[in-house]
Every structure is written in C-alpha cells, then in structure tokens.
A protein has these predicted regions:
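Charged, amphipathic alpha-helical linker segments immediately N-terminal to NTP-binding catalytic cores
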Residues: 1-11
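N-terminal, charge-rich interaction modules
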Residues: 9-89
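Short, charged beta->alpha transition segments
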Residues: 28-32, 112-123
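Residue-level preference for the first positions of well-ordered beta-strands
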Residues: 40-44, 129, 158-160
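Short acidic, S/G/P-rich loop/turn micro-motifs used as interaction or catalytic elements
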Residues: 49-54, 81-82, 106-112, 136-140, ...
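Long, charge-dense
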Residues: 72-116
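Conserved P-loop NTPase "ATPase switch" module shared by AAA+ and STAND
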Residues: 124-141
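Glycine-rich, aromatic-bearing surface loops/beta-hairpins
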Residues: 143-194
Length: 194
C-alpha cells in the first residue's frame, strides 16, 4: 500500500523500521505492572505489510533495545511451524496426494501450536519479552486473534507480536484483511504516536 493510500485510509503516515524501533523503545521505558491484565501484556508491533521482511531482518535491533532496557528476550517464528508439523504426521504422504483435505486437520494444528507456545512461555520470566514472529504465515490457516487470545493468559512478562497489518481504534487487520478484530492489546506504535 502506498504512503498516500495509507494516509487516506488510516489517517497516518506509513512508518519506517526506525520509527517502529523508536516506538518500541518508548514502550520499553514505561514501567511494567505485575498485575497487568492478560491483554495488557500483549504488545502488537503493527506496520505496513510491505515492511514485513525489513522488520524480520532487523529483529535483532528490537532484541538489543529490549536487552539494553534490562529485559530478557525469547523469540519464536511461526512461519515454518505448519510445514514442520504436517511433515511429522503419519498421514503426511496421503495428504500430499490430496492437499484439499488439509483443512480438516487445522484444529489439531492450532491445538499443537497453542500447547507449544505455552510451553515456551513457561520458560520465560516476568521480566522477559516473548517475540512472536511470522504471524502472517497463519493467514488462511488460522485466525491470529484466536491464537493470541488462547496464549495471552500464559504470558508472564510481555508478548510482542510482529503484526504486518493495520490498527485503528482498537481494531487490528492482519495483512489488511477486510475483517479485523477488536483487541485490547497495547499497540506499538500507539494511536497517540501516529
């Protein structure tokens, strides 16, 4: 989406990775409350989908910013997970011959993914950031909203979701999809910054 279209549609400028890093650093400067509700422990780093590769390529800078502010960092990339999970299944060879049947196993994959992420979150401390990347790879398979809602209660510190899409008035749209969802996560950048 061009910057002009972005401005017209969402009333703001398309941000650079440097802008996102600055917004992330600003969020890190806010003291964490231990009694924060689950939704408040979820940070949505949202950006134009055209920036996905740049954000992923510079994730190390976000990690460095977190570590410089005294926070721990854990990272999990969702992008390869469906392929790895399907390849381990006993029915993989049959599914390869009839890929149209893969839709029937998506609830099993979602349950597996939720359990895997929760197990990884259990290794985190209340001062850690768990960065969940590759959310765009779920598009068409699973709903990001369902996944995030299912794991939010297990987050001891903060969950940073890299989110290629849009945010306006509490509504998030992954990859500019028509249907968005209302979620009380902390947007980075915040509405006030943009």
């Amino acid at each position: 989406m061009s910057a002009a279209v972005w401005r017209r549609r969402w009333g703001c400028q398309s941000l650079s990775v440097e802008d996102l890093l600055e917004a992330f650093r600003s969020r890190l400067a806010v003291p964490w409350r231990s009694e924060e509700a689950a939704a408040g422990r979820v940070w949505m780093l949202w950006y134009d989908k055209a920036l996905e590769r740049r954000v992923r390529g510079r994730l190390g800078e976000f990690r460095l910013a977190a570590e410089q502010s005294g926070k721990g960092w854990h990272e999990f990339d969702l992008a390869p997970e469906f392929g790895k999970w399907v390849a381990r299944q006993t029915w993989f060879e049959r599914a390869a011959e009839k890929p149209s049947r893969l839709g029937t196993v998506l609830p099993d994959f979602e349950a597996h993914l939720i359990a895997d992420i929760k197990a990884r979150l259990s290794e985190c401390c209340p001062n850690d950031i768990f960065a969940l990347t590759g959310v765009a790879s779920l598009f068409g398979f699973l709903r990001a909203s369902s996944l995030i809602s299912s794991i939010a209660d297990a987050v001891p510190g903060r969950l940073l979701v890299t989110f290629p899409g849009t945010h306006q008035g509490g509504i998030y749209r992954l990859l500019d999809a028509r249907d968005g969802w209302s979620y009380l996560a902390v947007p980075i950048p915040s509405d006030a910054i943009v």
